[in-house]
């Protein structure tokens, strides 16, 4: 972990107070500075799912695992139901280089490479489109 956790660095208790105090600019600047300095804003990738918030426990298959081309980072605003960290648009992330472990509905765990073909990865993320995917595709 680098420096402080994302929660500690970007926690804002009340959006109204934030606007009134003028700290909104400071909060956005802190987020921008951290992002530009390559501080890993999602520096707790492998444990966020355990927090149980919707945006922490779900992910989509639009962006490949551990994407560096399209990183889905967020800054906290303290608004439990409206900030980016409560969004359901998160990509899968792992501390494993080159991919991530996935738990499948049949109970098996498989390592999915970050270089997986996007059509295959998107098909793995569907429930009822009827795709048949052989294991050699991922």
Residue ranges and their predicted role:
Residues 1-138:
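Surface-exposed loop/linker segments characteristic of extracytoplasmic
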């Amino acid at each position: 972990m680098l420096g402080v956790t994302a929660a500690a660095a970007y926690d804002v208790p009340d959006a109204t107070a934030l606007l009134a105090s003028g700290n909104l600019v400071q909060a956005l600047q802190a987020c921008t500075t951290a992002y530009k300095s390559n501080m890993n804003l999602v520096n707790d990738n492998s444990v966020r799912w355990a927090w149980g918030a919707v945006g922490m426990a779900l992910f989509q298959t639009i962006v490949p695992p551990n994407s560096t081309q399209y990183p889905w980072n967020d800054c906290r605003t303290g608004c439990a139901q409206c900030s980016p960290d409560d969004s359901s648009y998160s990509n899968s992330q792992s501390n494993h280089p080159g991919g991530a472990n996935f738990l499948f509905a049949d109970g098996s765990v498989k390592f999915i490479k970050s270089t997986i073909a996007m059509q295959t990865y998107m098909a793995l993320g569907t429930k009822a489109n009827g795709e048949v995917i052989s294991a050699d595709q991922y």
